[in-house]
């Protein structure tokens, strides 16, 4: 008598993601650390100098965190109302922030009290940034104005009122001391030169603008609003280069990698998309638990920090590169070669390989099938761990029972719990094309066996109704597909030119002038 052969579990093709260098790079960020803030995290900004601490603006506070700290190393809480846009200066020594009470405040990182308070706006200030010369501050407010402030004298230098709605974002140029851009809910982005009294350029984004970003080169500007991320060429007078629509909800924040080769965008759809700035295609994506309001990447690209609407701060550190240990150069004892002898031996083509017989350990369902316990074998693969994580094993056992002609007997005689587990599996996988042939047979047998007693259990009755709905929905779906297929055949038939059949008799060629 031949020995029992274990049940062969078929493998099905899986649609795996394409592994690229970007995928490997961005997946090297470790499991995130999460910190709960007092309110929604509206702004995250890294210090430009080491050790790259970062400011987190949330509710009425601005917290400063160290690179690896999970508690704030410093807190600025002297705001009368909600704080906005805590931003470091280029040297990392000063920090500016706006507030709901319309005042722009300037803080020294080593102190707590405000060094300067700039009053001039009449409504909340949502955007604050330093110019590249470090001596001026740009601000944008809900009063539709953007202002330029002088830090040493604490006075207003210039005021611009060209927007017709709230100004919620902006940025300054890292190359030009006088150039800055603002984005507004009036759908426009305006570029200003501090030496003039009006804007030098205007672009229409088409949606309320939530974030703007200037490339380090100063030639390109990125705007985010609605579901769109748009790239503009400033050197060509604000010409639109590309419009990206990869998010499902409003895009709220933007940031660049240190090299400028990757652009990151965060959205209310809980995704962070990473784009290549060469072709503006998505090269990677991060998923988060809540809608994203703010996003920042450390200057050395070793940290990604994301702020969400539920007040959670999500921090990911990049894993250090694995370094191969250097081979030891110490002299070894002569007997060492005895222990490592044959380590690098490669077998030749004509060598005879004698394998040691390995005793196969049968799975539980294989043991039951070997003992002809059909119903128990089916019970074994209907356990929650197998039917949810490895449905192909459950289907393989059903196929084996059908091959042996014992499928109907194995399905019969089940109590409410066992029948409920079987129906749950059917409801989940019945419309899967990979499992459809065998599961249709199982469903037919269940209906034949248990339809007379289905009303005795409310749970089973509800599952039978759901099974009917799933089948009806699939039938309607198939009918719609057949209709679409028929329409496509009609379109293709009208587009195809009639070709002469090879067996059709050729028409005679008449001489000129003949009828």
UniProtKB/Swiss-Prot annotation:
Part of the small subunit (SSU) processome, composed of more than 70 proteins and the RNA chaperone small nucleolar RNA (snoRNA) U3. May be a component of the proposed t-UTP subcomplex of the ribosomal small subunit (SSU) processome. It is found in: Nucleus, Nucleolus. It comes from Xenopus laevis (African clawed frog). Pfam families: UTP15_C, WD40. This is U3 small nucleolar RNA-associated protein 15 homolog. Its main location: nucleus. Signal peptide: none annotated. GO terms for cellular component: nucleolus; small-subunit processome. Ribosome biogenesis factor. Involved in nucleolar processing of pre-18S ribosomal RNA. Required for optimal pre-ribosomal RNA transcription by RNA polymerase I. Part of the small subunit (SSU) processome, first precursor of the small eukaryotic ribosomal subunit. During the assembly of the SSU processome in the nucleolus, many ribosome biogenesis factors, an RNA chaperone and ribosomal proteins associate with the nascent pre-rRNA and work in concert to generate RNA folding, modifications, rearrangements and cleavage as well as targeted degradation of pre-ribosomal RNA by the RNA exosome. The lineage of its organism: Eukaryota, Metazoa, Chordata, Craniata, Vertebrata. One of its GO terms (biological process) is ribosomal small subunit biogenesis. SUPFAM superfamilies: WD40 repeat-like. The keyword Chloroplast does not apply.
């Amino acid at each position: 008598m031949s020995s029992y052969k274990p049940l062969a579990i078929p493998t099905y093709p899986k649609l795996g993601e394409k592994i690229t260098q970007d995928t490997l790079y961005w997946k090297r960020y470790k499991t995130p650390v999460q910190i709960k803030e007092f309110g929604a995290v509206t702004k995250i900004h890294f210090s430009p100098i080491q050790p790259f601490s970062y400011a987190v603006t949330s509710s009425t506070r601005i917290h400063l965190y160290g690179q690896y700290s999970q508690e704030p190393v410093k807190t600025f809480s002297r705001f009368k109302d909600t704080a906005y846009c805590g931003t470091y200066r280029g040297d990392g020594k000063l920090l500016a922030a706006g507030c709901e009470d319309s005042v722009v405040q300037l803080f020294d990182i080593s102190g707590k009290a405000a060094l300067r308070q700039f009053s001039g706006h009449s409504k909340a200030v949502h955007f604050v940034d330093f110019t590249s010369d470090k001596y001026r501050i740009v601000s944008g407010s809900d009063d539709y104005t953007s202002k330029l402030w002088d830090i040493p004298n604490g006075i207003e230098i210039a005021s611009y009122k060209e927007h017709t709605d709230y100004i919620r974002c902006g940025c300054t140029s890292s190359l030009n001391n006088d150039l800055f851009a603002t984005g507004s809910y009036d759908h426009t982005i305006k570029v200003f030169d501090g030496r003039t009294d009006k804007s030098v350029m205007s672009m229409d984004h088409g949606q309320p603008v939530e974030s703007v970003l200037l490339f380090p080169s100063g030639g390109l500007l990125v705007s985010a609003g609605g579901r769109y991320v748009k790239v503009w060429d400033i050197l060509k007078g604000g010409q639109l280069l590309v419009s990206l629509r990869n998010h499902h909800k409003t895009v709220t924040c933007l940031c660049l990698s240190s090299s400028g080769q990757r652009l990151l965008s965060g959205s209310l759809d809980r995704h962070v998309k990473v784009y290549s700035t060469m072709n503006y295609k998505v090269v990677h994506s991060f998923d988060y638990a809540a809608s994203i309001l703010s996003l920042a990447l450390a200057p050395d690209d070793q940290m990604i920090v994301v702020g969400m609407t539920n007040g959670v701060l999500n921090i990911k550190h990049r894993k250090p590169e694995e370094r191969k240990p250097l081979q030891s150069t110490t002299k070894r004892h002569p007997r060492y070669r005895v222990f490592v002898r044959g380590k690098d031996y490669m077998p030749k083509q004509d060598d005879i390989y004698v394998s040691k017989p390995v005793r196969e350990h049968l799975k539980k369902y294989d043991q039951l099938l070997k003992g002809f316990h059909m119903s128990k074998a089916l019970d074994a693969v209907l356990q929650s761990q197998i039917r949810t994580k490895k449905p192909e094993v459950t289907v393989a056992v059903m196929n084996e029972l059908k091959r042996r002609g014992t499928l109907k007997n194995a399905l019969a005689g089940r109590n409410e719990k066992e029948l409920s587990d079987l129906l749950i599996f059917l409801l989940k996988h019945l419309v899967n094309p990979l499992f459809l042939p065998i599961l249709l047979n199982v469903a037919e047998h269940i209906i034949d066996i248990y339809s007379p007693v289905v009303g005795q259990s409310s749970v089973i009755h509800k599952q039978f109704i759901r099974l009917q709905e799933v089948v009806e929905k699939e039938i309607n779906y198939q009918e719609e597909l057949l209709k679409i297929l028929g329409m496509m055949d009609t379109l293709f038939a009208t587009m195809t030119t009639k070709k002469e059949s090879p067996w059709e008799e050729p028409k005679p060629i008449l001489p000129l002038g003949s009828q």
